[in-house]
C-alpha cells in the first residue's frame, strides 16, 4: 500500500516566483502556477499517474485532488479564479480510454475551491500519440496538438484555472493557453498533479 509520506510533494502554490511559473516565462502569459508532486522517471508519482491514466484507477485523481484542493483553498494565490478547465482528450482517445484522467482531479478541486468544473469549452481537435514513453526533447519537438474554443464569449473577463496531469515541457499547456488567450480580458493560471524537473 502507498503511504502519503512516500510521495515526493513539492506543492509550489504559495508564491509566484516558483519553477513552474518560470517555466512559462517568455512563452505565454499566466498569472500563477502550481503542482503537487515531483514526477521522476522511476518513482511513486509515475506509478500513480500511470495507474490513473491507463489502469482505470480514477480514485487516484480524487485522492490527489482532495489533498491538493485543501492546500490550494488555504492559499491566497488561487482565490480569484472563476472556473476550472481541464486539458481535453481528443474524443477518439477518450472513447478508447473510457474517461479523461483529469475528471476526478478536476471535480475534487472544484469541490474544495467552490468553482465550476467546465469540460465543454476547450476542445482538442487533433489526436496526438501517447507522450508517455517519449524523451523530453521528443515531446517538445513533436507537439503538434491543436485546440479550439467552443464558446469564446463565455470566457470573457474570466480567470481560468487550467489543469493537467503532468508538466514535462509545458508544450501542451502552452498550446491550450494560446487558444484561450484569444478570449477578451482573460487570465489563466495553471495547476497540475505533477511537475517534471
Regions picked out by a protein language model, each given a short descriptive name:
Residues 1-197:
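Glycine-rich phosphate/pyrophosphate-handling loop used in enzymes and phosphotransfer proteins
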Amino acid at each position: 500500500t502507498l503511504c502519503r509520506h512516500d510521495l515526493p510533494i513539492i506543492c509550489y502554490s504559495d508564491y509566484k516566483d516558483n519553477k513552474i511559473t518560470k517555466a512559462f516565462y517568455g512563452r505565454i502569459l499566466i498569472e500563477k502556477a502550481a503542482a503537487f508532486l515531483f514526477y521522476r522517471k522511476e518513482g511513486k508519482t509515475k506509478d500513480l499517474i500511470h495507474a490513473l491514466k491507463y489502469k482505470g484507477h480514477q480514485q487516484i485523481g480524487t485522492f490527489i485532488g482532495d489533498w491538493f484542493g485543501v492546500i490550494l483553498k488555504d492559499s491566497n494565490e488561487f482565490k480569484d479564479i472563476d472556473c476550472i478547465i481541464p486539458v481535453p482528450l481528443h474524443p477518439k482517445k477518450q472513447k478508447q480510454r473510457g474517461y479523461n484522467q483529469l475528471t476526478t482531479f478536476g471535480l475534487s478541486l472544484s469541490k474544495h475551491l467552490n468553482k465550476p468544473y467546465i469540460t465543454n469549452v476547450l476542445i482538442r481537435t487533433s489526436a496526438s500519440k501517447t507522450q508517455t514513453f517519449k524523451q523530453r526533447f521528443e515531446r517538445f519537438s513533436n507537439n503538434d496538438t491543436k485546440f479550439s474554443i467552443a464558446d469564446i464569449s463565455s470566457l470573457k473577463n474570466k480567470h481560468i484555472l487550467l489543469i493537467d496531469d503532468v508538466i514535462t515541457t509545458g508544450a501542451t499547456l502552452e498550446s491550450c493557453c494560446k487558444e484561450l488567450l484569444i478570449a477578451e480580458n482573460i487570465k489563466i493560471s495553471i495547476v497540475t498533479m505533477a511537475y517534471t524537473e
